[in-house]
Amino acid sequence: MQIWHMEPFPCGDRRLPHHVFPPKKITTTQLGALAGVQYYKVDLEDTASMKKRLSAVKTEKNVTFTDVFTVSETMLDFDDKMEQFYEAQTQKEDVISLVVEGTCYYDVEPEDDSWIRVQLEKGDLIVIPKGLSHRFTTTPQNFVKIQRFFSRKVEGTQG
């Protein structure tokens, strides 16, 4: 995982990094302090370790449902979906996502017009607290498979 402050008004391809200049990277600890976002690295190759970590998160966050969501250029209405995912939103429950394959960005907004970009890759688990404005996009590879976690069954939830 990599984390940095984004330029205030990114222009062009939103799938690019959009660092401020000079780049201002932050740590997972700083991200937690600034935005309340939690991060865990999950070793997907170590089944016992993975189950232990996921079980702890599920218990702590009262998770009962999961799904696997794949974003790729082959999906129906890909461009429209990407526009929808990039719209800033807040949720009524924590957004919990584990990247199973590929790479993506979650942008979080701890203060008005001050976005932090979180680049996630395979094995990265993120918990975005309810009520925090966030948005989602892919990297230029246009592919990510995410396992999402919910406290209740949710139909049609986006990023």
Swiss-Prot record:
CDD domains: cupin_ARD (cd02232). One of its GO terms (cellular component) is nucleus. HAMAP family: Salvage_MtnD_euk. Disulfide bonds: none annotated. The keyword Cytoplasm applies. PANTHER family: ACIREDUCTONE DIOXYGENASE (PTHR23418), INACTIVE ACIREDUCTONE DIOXYGENASE 1-RELATED (PTHR23418:SF10). GO terms for biological process: L-methionine salvage from methylthioadenosine; methionine metabolic process. Keywords: Cytoplasm, Nucleus. It is found in: Cytoplasm; Nucleus. Probable inactive acireductone dioxygenase. Coiled coil: none annotated. InterPro entries: ARD, ARD_euk, RmlC-like_jellyroll, RmlC_Cupin_sf. The keyword Ribosomal protein does not apply. Its main location: cytoplasm. This is Probable inactive acireductone dioxygenase 2. One of its GO terms (molecular function) is acireductone dioxygenase [iron(II)-requiring] activity. Belongs to the acireductone dioxygenase (ARD) family. It comes from Caenorhabditis briggsae.
